[in-house]
A protein has these predicted regions:
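A short helix->loop->beta-strand "cap" motif at the edges of active sites that frequently abuts
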Residues: 64-67, 80, 214-219, 236-239, ...
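N-terminal leader/targeting and accessory segments in enzymes
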Residues: 1-94, 98, 352-355, 380-381, ...
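ATP-dependent carboxylate-amine ligase
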Residues: 1-17, 43, 182, 196, ...
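Acidic-glycine-rich active-site phosphate/pyrophosphate-binding loop
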Residues: 119-123, 257-275, 320-323
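Short, polar loop motifs at secondary-structure junctions
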Residues: 69-76, 224-228, 245, 394-398, ...
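Phosphate-binding loop of NTP-binding sites
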Residues: 8-11, 91-224, 228-238, 432, ...
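Short beta-strands and strand-loop turn motifs
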Residues: 72, 107-108, 185-191, 223, ...
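Short gly/ser/thr-rich secondary-structure transition/capping motifs
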Residues: 22-31, 90-93, 141-144, 164-169, ...
Length: 461
């Protein structure tokens, strides 16, 4: 990171410096909340979590080489410097906002109900063909993760692609205030976090507030096939630019050739040109991701050849449409998270398989009052997509299985349906359900811990 002095840090987070004044002009080399990631001259931020209080690690990290710590507690007569703050979490955000303002860099902010991470990966892949890019790693997209990502920006970076996730009203504005995006991308307005945000209109309002702190001359890029985003009215004179499968969107595709699990070929149309590219990861949702990449690349001055190369170089990441050729099965690992829309997209991908199609699906969280109906909807959709075997795991997924069975009876489909309360129950019956060369989709909300299933299938002797 670009170095900051302790004096600058104390001012930025409205803290009180405690210690030898000789250290005030010393510069920190990094910021960490994890004691295991402390290196020489790190600033350690003592976050108090649900299970662990970072304050208990302050002596340890100072001995390990940290330059200073942010603390909510009076540490007394210690022989190392610290900065006293009222809230370490708020101080972390304030410091990240200050650091972002010191950087001469373009920022692309990405949010949405579905596809934030895969869209982030696509946009970063595209932009990397022209720029030195930093992107959000993993799921570091909240009030803790976003600041830590911002601190990883170095002076040589030209563009930062930052994922911004929310679950409650009021979550977005602090993130946007830190990121100060030049380009705002919203992938869609779906049903994730309905439990907290009430309605899709509530989700739109909260996610749309990302534009409140953006560059006044920046670009707003939305999915034009999403009914809620299409209804979004411009703010402060910024009218969204739309991408989508429909030709009315300035950025769209024509001549789509779907090649099953080998991906998609398409002709991409921009306001001024058109070009062809191959998307290696299957599914129409990946076409949307690529279109977002095209629109962002276009906004940041890239040419068609650069954008096409970036699209074609994208590789999947674990837990998100990652195709694994295991010894006995082909596994579609999409188990990082789930909601009704992403479940359907994944079942669409499974439908491309040439072998027997098996879906192992689990509970979806934070869907609010309609959660049972939404699980039933997914079960019926699995039958509609001609899935051969549906395995439902979890309490909520019992309704998914019941709806699937009802659909099979009503439509005379040939899908076999199983329900298990736990993963362990499924493991005991796995040998009777799965067959050699099956193509298996694995997907559920994060709390279901389905990577364990992927690991078990991958390592089966």
């Amino acid at each position: 990171m670009k170095h900051m002095t302790l004096s600058e840090i104390a001012d930025a987070c409205c803290g009180i410096y405690c210690g030898d004044p000789a250290f005030l002009d010393c510069e920190v080399s990094s910021v960490a909340i994890d004691s295991r990631k402390v290196v020489k001259d790190t600033l350690f931020v003592a976050i108090k979590g649900a299970r662990v209080d970072g304050h208990s690690f302050i002596p340890q990290v100072m001995e390990a080489g940290a330059l200073c710590s942010l603390s909510e507690q009076d540490l007394g007569d210690v022989d190392y410097p610290y900065i006293r703050v009222s809230s370490c979490t708020e101080a972390l955000k304030d410091l990240a906002e200050h650091y972002r303002r010191s950087l001469d860099i373009k920022v692309v902010g990405i949010t949405g109900s579905v596809g934030k991470t895969s869209t982030k990966e696509m946009i970063a892949s595209v932009l990397s063909e022209k720029y030195n890019v930093l992107k959000t790693e993993g799921n570091f997209n909240n009030e803790i993760g976003l600041p830590l990502t911002v601190f990883n920006i170095r002076e040589e970076h030209e563009v930062a692609v930052l994922e911004m996730g929310i679950s409650h009203f009021g979550d977005m504005k602090p993130l946007a205030k830190i990121a100060r995006p030049d380009v705002c991308v919203i992938t869609n307005i779906g049903y994730a976090h309905l439990e907290n945000l009430g309605t899709r209109d509530g989700i739109l309002k909260e996610k749309g507030s990302m534009t409140d702190y953006m560059n006044p001359k920046g670009s707003v890029i939305f999915n034009g096939d999403d009914d809620k985003l299409k209804s979004y009215t411009s703010r402060d004179g910024r009218t969204p630019v739309y991408f989508g499968l429909t030709s009315s969107c300035p950025f769209h595709v024509e001549n789509i050739e779907r090649k099953g699990l080998k991906g998609t070929y398409a002709e991409f149309v921009t306001p001024t040109s058109r070009f062809h590219a191959h998307i290696s990861i299957p599914g129409d949702h990946m076409i949307y991701n690529a279109l977002a990449g095209v629109a962002v690349g276009y906004a940041l001055g890239m040419d068609n050849d650069e954008i096409a190369r970036g699209i074609e170089k994208l590789v999947p990441i674990a837990g998100r449409n990652n195709l694994i050729e295991a010894k006995h099965y082909t596994i579609i690992d999409d188990c990082y998270n789930a909601n009704p829309a992403s479940m359907k997209s994944s079942l669409d991908v499974l439908a491309y398989a040439d072998t027997r199609k098996v879906a192992i699906l689990g509970d979806m969280g934070e869907l609010g009052a309609d959660e049972l109906a939404m699980h039933r909807e997914v079960g019926a959709y699995a039958a509609f997509k001609n899935t051969d075997v549906l395995v439902c795991i979890g309490a909520l997924s019992k309704d998914m299985a019941e709806a699937a069975k009802e659909t099979v009876l009503a439509t005379e489909k040939n899908m076999k349906v199983f329900h298990f309360d736990t993963k362990e129950d499924f493991y005991q019956n796995m040998g009777q359900i799965l067959k050699e060369n099956d193509t298996i989709l694995v997907k559920a909300s994060h709390f279901m811990e389905f990577p364990e299933i992927v690991k078990k299938l991958s390592e089966e002797a």
